[in-house]
Regions:
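Non-transmembrane, amphipathic alpha-helical segments
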Residues: 4-7, 27, 31-35, 81-84, ...
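Charged alpha-helical initiation segments
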Residues: 1-35, 146-150
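Generic structural signal for well-ordered, non-transmembrane alpha-helical segments
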Residues: 40, 44, 90, 97, ...
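A conserved mid-domain beta-alpha-beta active-site/ligand-binding segment of alpha/beta enzyme cores
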Residues: 155-180
């Protein structure tokens, strides 16, 4: 099991770094979605390794060939549904799952604080669970998430998108501000 735990942690670190590299490369238009995909993957692998370390199975009891979903793993590790880390991960997971690439570019500035919190949480949690200093793999100055432009106002969103999508975006933006 030690070998599986180590492989999960190693892959987790790689996914984490890849997410940061994608996000911080300004020429990539798919960077918000790419970051959310890789950062969630990094968390999933790191938390599964933490479960193994605690002596818990990472497989569904009724399907021993299938590992637990990231949602289940997050709930097992962060049992309090109001934990800031859990809320942060669930919001990024929601973004990853809905994959609204044509919308998220306009909200990059709103996602940046959420993503930055996720990065810092990962740094702290990989240290707590696995005693790993992430700066041994990536320089500390690369742990910063940067956003490059001002968000659209609610008025601009309403002019740019259909009423249904505009209201969804405004609601999503308000939720992000609460979590940041």
């Amino acid at each position: 099991m030690e070998d599986i735990k180590k492989r999960l942690v190693d892959k987790s670190i790689e996914a984490f770094i890849l997410g940061l590299e994608i996000y911080n490369k300004p020429t990539i238009k798919y960077r918000i979605e790419g970051f959310s995909f890789f950062i969630i993957n990094a968390w999933e692998l790191m938390l599964k390794a933490a479960l193994i370390k605690r002596g818990e199975s990472i497989y569904f009891p009724d399907k021993p060939d299938r590992t637990l979903s990231v949602e289940v793993v997050i709930r097992k590790i962060y049992t309090d549904k109001n934990t800031r880390i859990r809320l942060n991960l669930e919001k990024i997971l929601e973004l990853r799952n809905i994959s609204t690439h044509y919308i998220t570019e306009d909200y990059e500035i709103k996602y940046a604080p959420l993503f930055q919190a996720c990065v810092l949480n990962f740094v702290n949690e990989i240290k707590r669970f696995h005693d790993i200093d992430i700066t041994q793999f990536i320089a500390q100055n690369f742990l910063t998430i940067s956003a490059s432009y001002e968000p659209l106002s609610n008025e601009e969103i309403r002019l740019k998108y259909s009423p249904e999508i505009a209201e969804k975006l405004i609601k999503q933006g308000n939720e992000l501000e609460v979590l940041s």
